[in-house]
């Protein structure tokens, strides 16, 4: 953080205090911090000689992922004896996004590694339903969405579409920010860390997929810090998608917006998504039913239970 103060007058300013409220997720030198009414405030003191300009730099440690904004700064200046002082509040617009910690590939759990590996393999061999090149007779197990009705009418028997191989696989990671099916209150510190680790896992898997040519997206049953916007990023494999993904992760509140089964029920899979990774601390019949709905739409669904997770039916 950089503070710049100037004194253009011919008279000195014996002392100037700059004070601003800081989020707990940002760390400064303990000597410059003070707790007031439960909030942390960063304070700096200056002596400004006549017609001088001072620049002071502070090292900031990003302790937690988040979306941090500094909107006002309180400025106080006084004379040498401290008998009088002038106060002024200045508006500012400082904005800092702290991204989640990314895992090393070796830290990714085996089920998620296998899921990612299958997505990348099918990048070269997976049929793309948008690239129809003909038809063949129906076989047991063919999904209903692949029926070729025009060819079936011509031949008098059921036909299914045949497709060229796809070079653009799409995957979607779905994160459950609730620790249990009965949770309604905010997460405790220990539970919050479990979900933070899950968010790091989700971001790492998506970025690895994008780096290797696949399209990846992320959604969660929570909202973002600004205006309660739902946490949803549709799959893409562009370079800009990586920045958008990290920004989304930084802005997530981890406060449950709706139950995970309700979130899944209202979710419509984006066109072309054939791989879905669910990250959740628990799995019950309601979640299983929604996962089965995605499978009926032709998607491969993998449900990974997070640390200490439980399966109930």
Label each PLM-derived region with a short phrase.
Residues 1-228:
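An amphipathic, basic-hydrophobic helix/alpha-beta surface used to engage anionic
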Residues 24-25, 224-229, 239, 243-313:
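Von Willebrand factor type A / integrin I
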Residues 236:
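A charged helix-plus-loop insertion that forms the helical arch/lid used to bind
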């Amino acid at each position: 953080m950089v503070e710049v103060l100037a004194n253009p007058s011919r008279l000195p300013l014996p002392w100037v205090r700059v004070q601003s409220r800081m989020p707990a997720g940002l760390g400064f030198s303990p000597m410059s911090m003070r707790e007031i009414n439960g909030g942390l405030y960063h304070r700096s003191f200056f002596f400004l000689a006549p017609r001088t300009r001072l620049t002071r730099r502070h090292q900031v440690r990003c302790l937690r992922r988040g979306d941090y904004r500094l909107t006002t700064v309180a400025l106080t200046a006084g004379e040498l004896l401290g008998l009088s002082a002038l106060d002024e509040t200045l508006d500012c617009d400082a904005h800092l996004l702290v991204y989640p910690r990314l895992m090393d590939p070796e830290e990714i759990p085996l089920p998620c590694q296998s899921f990612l590996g299958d997505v990348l393999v099918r990048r070269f061999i997976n049929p793309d339903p948008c690239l129809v090149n003909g038809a063949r007779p129906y076989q047991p197990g063919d999904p209903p969405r692949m029926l070729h009705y025009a060819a079936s009418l011509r031949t008098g028997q059921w036909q299914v579409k045949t497709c060229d191989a796809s070079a653009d696989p799409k995957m979607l990671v779905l994160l459950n920010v609730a620790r249990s099916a009965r949770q309604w209150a905010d997460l405790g510190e220990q539970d919050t860390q479990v979900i933070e680790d899950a968010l790091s896992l989700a971001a790492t898997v998506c970025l690895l997929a994008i780096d290797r040519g696949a399209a990846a997206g992320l959604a969660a049953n929570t909202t973002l810090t600004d205006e309660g916007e739902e946490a949803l990023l549709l799959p893409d494999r562009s370079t800009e998608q990586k920045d958008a993904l990290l920004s989304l992760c930084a802005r997530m509140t981890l406060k449950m917006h709706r139950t995970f089964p309700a979130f899944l029920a209202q979710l419509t899979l984006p066109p072309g998504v054939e791989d879905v990774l669910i990250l959740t601390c628990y799995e019950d019949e309601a979640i299983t039913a929604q996962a089965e709905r995605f499978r009926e739409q032709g998607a491969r669904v993998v449900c990974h239970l997070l640390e200490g997770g439980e399966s109930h039916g």
